[in-house]
Each structure stands twice: as structure tokens, then as C-alpha cells.
Amino acid sequence: MTLAELNTALKTITGFSKKVVYRAWPVGQAPPLPFITYMVDDSDNFGADDIVYKAINRVNIELYSKNKDTVSEGLIEALLESLSIYWEKDETYIDDEQCYEIIYTIEV
């Protein structure tokens, strides 16, 4: 899967067609919560003999919401499972923004 394909897939989630962006919204242009951002965080390439045989990007998909949003979390998880993408999940509360951040880490 490419990043463009991931972007398209995330926009198919009910309620998020215009609430998905790579990395961050321009200052002052973020839509109301909830919304999704995604970005390449790292790589975990497969290689040998000083050659990369398979480039693998580690991508964070971040769901931001005012309250704990198990419905949106379930929709993201169902999408990833339908695409046969293994994911790990982490959660934090951002005091300055007064919102929850759910981070899904995947590899593409």
C-alpha cells in the first residue's frame, strides 16, 4: 500500500471524507474534532549486502477527538483489518489541546 492509497482509504471512513490530512493542518484550518492525521514516522527496511530489498515505512495514523471516541476507533480498526494491515495502538490525552490522541502504528 502507498501513502496515497492509505489517504484514500482513510477518507472512506464514515464522517472523515474531509477530515484526513498528511502530518498537520495548516494553522487555523483544522476542522472540528474528530479528525485524522497520518505521517511517516520511521522506516524498517529489509535489506542485505548493503542493498534495500524492501522499503518499509512505519506510519502513524492519529485520531484526535474531544472525548474518548470508541466509534471512530472501531471504524479505523475495521478499515485496517479489512485491508489486512497489522496495527499497534497507543492513547494519550493532550492537556494543552484538551483532546484525546489515539495513535495507530502500521507498516506500508
Language-model regions: role of each:
Residues 80-93:
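Low-complexity, intrinsically disordered Gly/Pro/Thr-rich segments
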Residues 63-67, 106-108:
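Short beta-strand-to-loop capping motifs
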Residues 57-62:
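Active-site-adjacent structural patch at catalytic or cofactor/ligand-binding sites
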Residues 1-43:
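Small/polar-rich, solvent-exposed N-terminal microdomains that initiate assembly or binding
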Residues 1-9, 41-48, 52-56, 90-108:
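Short, charged interaction patches at domain edges and termini
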Residues 68-75:
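Short, conserved charged micro-motifs
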Residues 9-16, 75-83:
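Generic non-transmembrane alpha-helical segments
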